[in-house]
Amino acid sequence: VRPRIKICHLLLDPNQPQDIPKDKWDSVMAKQRASVSAFEKISSNFACYSQMYSVVNRTELPSENCAQPEIIDRSKDFINNPPVLSYGHYGAYVAHRSAVEDFGNYDALIVVESDVVYDLSPEEFTQKIYDAYEFGLARSGAMFTFGAVSYGTASRASVSDTAIYMGDYKQIDHFLCAHCYMIFESEKESIQSKLANSGWHAWDIWLYWNYDTRVPIFSTLEPIVHEPEGYSVIDYQKKIL
């Protein structure tokens, strides 16, 4: 019997671009359509595939309950001067948090951002996910990431390679960016409790601050998903990952 894995796809409401210029919004939506098409191809292989739509956030940016309020930038100009917390960062945090809080009765939850695609066949990609689940489960894993791994500044992993290599996988201290990752059911209560008792931040930084070196986290040796080039509503710039 296959484990019951839920995939939650975080998507932006295509009909509500707010004040984002049309050419930039068109870029975001083209990436989103490609991502939806890719994940709908594997949806029937999992216990649940859910699409969670949000309106792109251009209004809410609370300083209360923020882990680092001094870097909040309320400018609505489309510029990015890190370190910064923008409307886009808060919108993404809320979306990831909602997905985690709505984990449900599953063996694992996979959270996928709106622009993520994969190059494998749908069958191969599905198998990689189930293999990763079994690998992590056997090693008391809390989380598993399928994307490219980088590390937060000032972490020990950013100074030297702290990964433990195991064939097709590696154990890591933490991971940025968090665009396609799995949370095991054993971690559900803990991460929901952390969310209830900590301030908000850019989602991958929140994960880094709350999880660095604390629990077993794994990744595929090489990323099996990526985000295509195009406009980002979080970083306000073109990105290739």
Regions picked out by a protein language model, each given a short descriptive name:
Residues 1-112, 116-241:
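An acidic/histidine-cluster motif and surrounding catalytic segment
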